[in-house]
Amino acid sequence: QMRPYIMCHMVMSMNGLVTGDFLWTKESEIASSIYFSLHREYRKNGFDGFVCGRTTMEESFTKGSPWNLESTPNLEALEENQKPFYAVAFDPKGKLGWKRNFISDEDPGYDKCRILEVLSEQVNKQYVEYLKKHQIPFIVNGKDFINVENSLEQMYEKFGIRKLLLEGGSVVNGHFFKANVVDEISLVIVPQVAFGGKPLFAEGTLANFELVKLKQESGCIVCQYRKRV
């Protein structure tokens, strides 16, 4: 079966956390700016989209805005002069309230990303109607949580997604890791030990990677690992 190549791209503390108060420190701001510039580079160089879980999408883009079937859709279309770059939302129950079918963001790495919703069978039928009305494409897959492998096959076949950035949070990263589909890991490591957050992968089993890139930038470690086959 064919699926996209997956690179998990994250900012992480020295002790492996990806969420928590440390993300609001000056050190993390520096790490984040390196992270976002790498994301822009990946977008320019052959990646077809990024995937995040509902919580991360909500914090970054929809800001907790509820969906409403009665809302008038903003059907302003993206120019179709290039292959779309997808913002893939793993949203099992269908909770994200998008205002239109693409993201507008001041960061060109995320601006004009076409939204693709991935849902489980737990989704409310009205949410599916809401997506249709807003012309937001979707995949429904998996009983309680989303079936990662099947969803990836559909992304590959129906949406032409060949390379995908996996950008958190911990839970969705863990689902991908457990499904054994993480091919590469790209990290910006903040020079801090942090507490009260979640790890890079919430679940999974031991896996071997090899270091393919390593540099130091503004006090952070920037590195890339590829899965050992």
What is the role of each PLM region?
Residues M2-V229:
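Enzymes that bind and transform nitrogen-containing heteroaromatic metabolites
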